[in-house]
Amino acid sequence: GFIHADFTHLFFNLFSFFFFGVQLEQIFNQLFPSIASELYILFYVLAIVVADLPTFFKQKNNPNYNSLGASGAVSAVIFAGILFFPTEKIYLFGFFGIPGFIYAGLFTWYSVEMDKRSRDFVNHSAHLYGALFGIVAMTLLYPQVWISFVEQITAMLR
């Protein structure tokens, strides 16, 4: 989770983590003020582990398989943030903005499709399971997030 294949891989993870991580850290500070830092670090480290577990079990007997990066944990941070701000625009390629909940659907679809093909040496299932971890963890930590999630999307669609 802390080693990356190359500078580009590291850059995109850090870039994404910076923008979404700061926002999620602020949410943790508001919701859990006395333990926010510890809980946030625990959330991130658990996301690294949980996101890679399915791949570990799938590939445990394959000595040629390698997986690097923190993309699963970054996906957890992004999806946890989307739960709180589903209508905030996420800009693809710097200029094409789409609401977070639509991005989440597209990202999930892309990760599932690419994982089926798995020809590009990217651990797409880590992205998928990291995203799932972010959703499940935030639901367990703050179940009320779903009320706000639905209200924001409903208000946007009016």
Give the ranges of each region predicted by the language model.
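A detector for small-residue-rich transmembrane helices and their helix-helix packing motifs
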Residues: 1-158
